[in-house]
Amino acid sequence: MTITPQHLIALLPLLIVGLTVVVVMLSIAWRRNHFLNATLSVIGLNAALVSLWFVGQAGAMDVTPLMRVDGFAMLYTGLVLLASLATCTFAYPWLEGYNDNQEEFYLLVLIASLGGILLANANHLAALFLGIELISLPLFGLIGYAFRQKRSLEASIKYTILSAAASSFLLFGMALVYAQSGNLSFEALGKSLGDGMLHEPLLLAGFGLMIVGLGFKLSLAPFHLWTPDVYQGAPAPVSTFLATASKIAIFGVVMRLFLYAPVGDSEAVRVVLGIIAFASIIFGNLMALSQTNIKRLLGYSSISHLGYLLVALIALQSGEMSMEAVGVYLAGYLFSSLGAFGVVSLMSSPFRGPDADSLYSYRGLFWHRPVLAAVMTVMMLSLAGIPMTLGFIGKFYVLAVGVQASLWWLVAAVVVGSAIGLYYYLRVAVSLYLHAPQQPGRDAPTNWQYSAGGIVVLISALLVLVLGVWPQPLISLVQLAMPLM
């Protein structure tokens, strides 16, 4: 096909981030300067965000058979770019105390965000696999960035080996799907499934293997075993990216796949996904109860959040409300996670060995950093789904979708999981207001609110509260971001 100027406009975010990768690479080769490379990365990501307006003006279109640029792709591209931007701003003060090479961090984040944008636009199983690999490979380096820390290196090796195994499952599943249907395009797969091919054993085996591969990337039970160790071992800014950008991008492409190729019409697939969702919600919340490490706690909580989202995915065939539910929930999850991990990043900056991830480090935080403690409280309440926060709106949507689709056992799991989650989120919030220990451990800088990371954390808290009280702007945005059918 011929690439026209319209196609280039549609690909602007991808092209801008790709160009930023090249510029940062050349800048590192020319002269190592931490501030310069961080600034170039942030400018590139901001330019990519601004370019989404021009993409919207160009309208929805297919750019090559691999990619479809529409409102849905723009929404998920925007969320990935916001997460990448936050990761870079949290990383800057953390890297200030890091004695080894600092600049490559931004390069790896940019390449991973490139993979996230590709996933948001993917309309083909080949693009899906390329995007997942492009987002996973830089994460191997990012997770082990503090390689002199034994735990960071261990987390990187663990993620690398398990990720390679998951990718092989995904690829083998795609091969079986192609062998049976002769197609890799989402829409062509949809036509094949419509012709009565959905119940073919080879096709179901292929989709089963793909669910294993994607379940690992989304850290769904029982493919979640890497999650707490990797969240704990990775530097705090990397855990931010891992919890937000990679999960959002992969879940977005899975939504598009299930929408165009209605795999969920198969009772066998629905039952398997239902069991995975149920296990993720209950197991994630139960395991988080006993955690004293805040990054491990957030790791287990992310398993349960992906379980809640899976309920909306299973209900996808029951109406457009499922699409809305996922969009609103992911936005709430993004801002809540950015705030929570942002506070951990600020407390851990500059780099001085292990992060401030023990719950004891946050005991009595209110008495010397009251605003930071208030931000952390808001994030915990939002993740718990308390009314007047954005997390409540997302959870309400998921429950409404579950009821609409008559998924009563999953609705019960969401209610029970939320009740369990309330305990451990409030445990973190309450510890912030207890008496401070005689010898406080790590602490955020006194002027944290004037740093770029501090501003991101404050904006996240503000959005969680404002959109929790008045969610209509977000709901309208998500309704506009419907995929081109």
Curated annotation (Swiss-Prot):
One example of a Gene Ontology biological process annotation: ATP synthesis coupled electron transport
Cellular compartments per GO CC: plasma membrane
Catalytic activity: a quinone + NADH + 5 H(+)(in) = a quinol + NAD(+) + 4 H(+)(out)
E.C. no: 7.1.1.-
Any Pfam family: Proton_antipo_M
Membrane-spanning parts: 8-28, 35-55, 71-91, 105-125, 127-147, 159-179, 203-223, 235-255, 271-291, 297-317, 326-346, 373-393, 408-430, 455-475
Entry keywords, A to Z: Cell inner membrane, Cell membrane, Membrane, NAD, Quinone, Translocase, Transmembrane, Transmembrane helix, Transport, Ubiquinone
Recorded topology in the membrane: Multi-pass membrane protein
GO molecular function, one term: NADH:ubiquinone reductase (non-electrogenic) activity
Subcellular location: Cell inner membrane
InterPro entries listed in its UniProt record: NADH-Q_OxRdtase_suN/2 (IPR010096), ND/Mrp_TM (IPR001750)
Superkingdom, taxonomy of origin: Bacteria
Quaternary structure, from the entry: NDH-1 is composed of 13 different subunits. Subunits NuoA, H, J, K, L, M, N constitute the membrane sector of the complex.
Role noted for this protein: NDH-1 shuttles electrons from NADH, via FMN and iron-sulfur (Fe-S) centers, to quinones in the respiratory chain. The immediate electron acceptor for the enzyme in this species is believed to be ubiquinone. Couples the redox reaction to proton translocation (for every two electrons transferred, four hydrogen ions are translocated across the cytoplasmic membrane), and thus conserves the redox energy in a proton gradient.
Family classification: Belongs to the complex I subunit 2 family.
Protein name, as recorded: NADH-quinone oxidoreductase subunit N
Organism, as annotated: Salmonella paratyphi C (strain RKS4594)
